[in-house]
Amino acid sequence: MKSSEIRQKFLQFFQSKGHTIVPSSSLVPANDPTLLFTNSGMVQFKDVFTGKEARAYKRATSSQRSVRAGGKHNDLENVGYTARHHTFFEMLGNFSFGDYFKREAIQYAWELLTQVYKLPAEKLWVTVYQEDDEAYDIWAKEVGVPAERIIRIGDNKGARYASDNFWQMADTGPCGPCSEIFYDHGPEIWGGPPGSPEEDGDRYIEIWNLVFMQFERDAAGNMERLPKPCVDTGMGLERIAAVLQHVHSNYEIDLFQKLIAAAARETGVKDLADNSLKVIADHIRACAFLIVDGIIPSNEGRGYVLRRIVRRALRHGYKLGQTKSFFHRLVPDLVAEMGEAYPELAQVAERVAQVLRQEEERFGETLEHGMKILDGALAKVAKGDPLDGTTLFTLYDTYGFPVDLTADICREREVEVDMAGFEAAMQRQREQARAAGKFKMAEGLSYEGAETRFEGYENLELSGVKVTALYVEGTQVEQVSAGQDAVVVLDATPFYAESGGQVGDTGLLEAGGVRFAVADTLKIQPGVFGHHGTLEAGALKVGDTLLARVDAVRRARTVRNHSATHLMHKALREVLGAHVQQRGSLVDPDKTRFDFAHDAPMTAEQIARVEAIVNAEVLANQATEAKVMAYDDAVKGGAMALFGEKYGDTVRVLDIGFSRELCGGTHVRRTGDIGLFKVVSEGGVAAGVRRIEAITGDNALAWVQDQNALLQRAAGVLRAPAHELPERIAQVQEQLKALEKELEQARTKLAASAGNDLVATATVEVKGIKVLAASIGDVDPKALRGMVDNLKDRLKPAVVLLAAGSADGKISLVGGVTADLTGRIKAGDLVGFVAGQVGGKGGGRPDMAMGGGTDLAALPAAVASVQKWVDERL
């Protein structure tokens, strides 16, 4: 039975049992930055199981694309070494949301396996949780599985309810016992049943896990029964296919055999059992579908996991002797194998191949060199010693080798790696980066008081704020004198502290004769705002009360840019695709600078579309709304959360126009306050990362006015209205080309005339051969070459060398030898001989060569030496 048929029969079976077929969700979990990848079928139903979301159906079935690489669930290092580990796999599942429970789940599973897939009942074993008598009785009394093939598994992980047969979503929340179904391959395969000392063998293979969510676990570990228990089951397509296709390795099923053959074709390998081919076949599936879902290779988060998988595949290709790009050429084979089940793959296959090809080219530049470094280091490692952390770090930092890739190579050669040394090298680099950072005093100042109360969302001026701490050169003090630079901590402030890419506010702290100019605002600790600046007048003491006033003009420009950044982020995703993710940002009064994941330069048309979308939102003049709510409620409501950011239980959600993001920054009250949005630059900053800069409000107006003034000046110079400039510039270019052609013709005539003079005045005969060597003033090298060609034809057999010295002191040399003489005299040798005398070099073909030099004073003697040089060679 083919894998496609197994998948189809599974979905159709549960559809016949009243289940709704739900398409596979993205490998990027929707609005859940805490989870790296979708790694099981239940992920897209998580909020349904917890009661936070309601669906129109109570029974569902799906074939879910899943990835287990990176993060908590990571099978990457095992791929290629075992028969059943994959980075990408398909999870077949059926789900009940408060509808049926254990009895139906067990009966459905048994019916599908024995009646639809026709597996022999005597080959199936099951496990249940030690205390789950209900499931045991259903298997034994209703399904009829003999007691000797039902195994109770207790708490085998060191704690209550810590068992292979007890599932929990997290430390708290829904949980419950599970029942696993195993297939017995027979006594000819080594291994024992689950729970036995030999359970790690390959005889008994788990094919299906039925999870019964019947409890709610609180923080104290207490278990309460759920009023509406749920069912979550998962069966790996690759595993059940191996059973139904009568093979013992997932890599022997039809899904993999064609991909392995394709990998062999592209690497030139004949042995289809080579483990490296299995790695490549596995990795093309993971890489392609990650790109389908908008992830591109990068140096952080999900993008870095993708990069690690790609580079691991390339390394295995290199191991097989393939040093050229090959990985991207497997995409059509993957589409042929899986495109029907997942049409989204076929739709973006060209883009998938493009992204992979770019990553191959990027890593290919360093792979060979890095492997030489690693091979050399491994050759020096004494038996039993690890590869040192410094080499690990060098390969990572300089040659782009993910540390797990290096560890994988070392594992093949039975060498351990010094991870502690690697981490130490990483830490040293971080400390050096911090030491070179802009704000050395921004963090880590000793402070034990209350957090600063921020009131800058609504107020730019706040009276009666109290000084709670003062710092001079990093040391806490009680008083600051006029002229000193210091950091002031207040109990409350309207000043925004640098965070989330937005720069800190500037302004004044005043009281009586005291005046402190705030040059920047930074957090010295989480929740504690440090006002960095200079005391311009008076004396400032801890406990003093001040008036805090933010620079309103600067803040207004900053908030315009920050709000525009949100709109631009959304517009970029609309124009370029959902793979666009923030990689960094800087929002200051002058501009917004936004780094984002994308693998190609934006076209002028794409930039114009982004501008149009953002300015349409500006013109709509919609009110900006900020709400503080629970994090789970925020992401459920569609707020964009950034992967890798740390969020608390309570977050601030900003709605501005069509954008909804988690953001603690300051913003305009209405989109119309942005005024005008204009992109001023777009370029690359790193592999797979683009940077776009834009301006707003009065800055954008000033930019437009400057551009218009420049346009008007150009129109004045060309004596044409601005709207006719393209045509007028084209006319000028045509006129310039015509004049250049006329000039070239004039030079040719002049050169011909000069040639006539040279023939008459500078030609000598050496052993029956005409030799002409002369310096003719400032002549274009191209014209000089034409003259040499002309003179060769007129004088043959002949040797010709012409030199021209320009006003800037550069010498051009052209030498020519007629074809009948190149066996004895070569133009390249001649030009090299002369160029060497004038401080230069030269070379070329035997019949024509060019060179140059810089010593004008030596040129006459060098030219005069040609006659003797030729004579010596005849």
Swiss-Prot record:
Cofactor(s) the record lists: Zn(2+)
Keyword Lyase: no
Subcellular location field: Cytoplasm
UniProt key word DNA-binding: no
Record-listed E.C. numbers: 6.1.1.7
Cofactor stoichiometry and binding remark: Binds 1 zinc ion per subunit.
Gene Ontology molecular function, alphabetical: alanine-tRNA ligase activity; aminoacyl-tRNA deacylase activity; ATP binding; tRNA binding; zinc ion binding
Pfam families reported in the protein's UniProt record: DHHA1, tRNA-synt_2c, tRNA_SAD
Key words of the record: Aminoacyl-tRNA synthetase, ATP-binding, Cytoplasm, Ligase, Metal-binding, Nucleotide-binding, Protein biosynthesis, RNA-binding, tRNA-binding, Zinc
Family, as annotated: Belongs to the class-II aminoacyl-tRNA synthetase family.
Classification via NCBIfam families: alaS
Name of this protein: Alanine--tRNA ligase
